[in-house]
């Protein structure tokens, strides 16, 4: 498995999911971000609103933002960190 960074987040409302996706997509990079559950068995593209909305309905208690490219987690999502 590639080395990557991971941060626990919480998205409780649809508006928070929309704001989160907007923040991730405004970082100006092509970095691959994903949301995954605690044991890494379920993943979605964090840049996809549909994926994020679905993921938060199924796995909201244990949601992690992952940088698959080994870089840092953008500071624009700090307000969603747990």
Question: What are these model-predicted stretches?
Answer:
Residues 15-33, 41-61, 73-81:
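Amphipathic alpha-helical interaction surfaces in cytosolic regulatory modules
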Residues 12, 31-35, 67:
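Structural preference for solvent-exposed beta-strand-turn elements
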Residues 2-11:
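Short glycine-/aliphatic-rich beta-strand segments at the starts of folded cytosolic domains
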């Amino acid at each position: 498995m590639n080395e990557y960074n991971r941060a626990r987040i919480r998205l409780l409302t649809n508006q928070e999911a929309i704001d989160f996706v907007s923040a991730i997509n405004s970082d100006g990079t092509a970095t691959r971000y994903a949301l995954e559950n605690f044991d890494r068995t379920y993943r979605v593209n964090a840049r996809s609103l549909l994926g994020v909305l679905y993921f938060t309905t199924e796995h909201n208690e244990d949601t992690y933002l992952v940088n698959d490219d080994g870089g840092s987690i953008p500071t624009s999502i700090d307000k969603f960190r747990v």
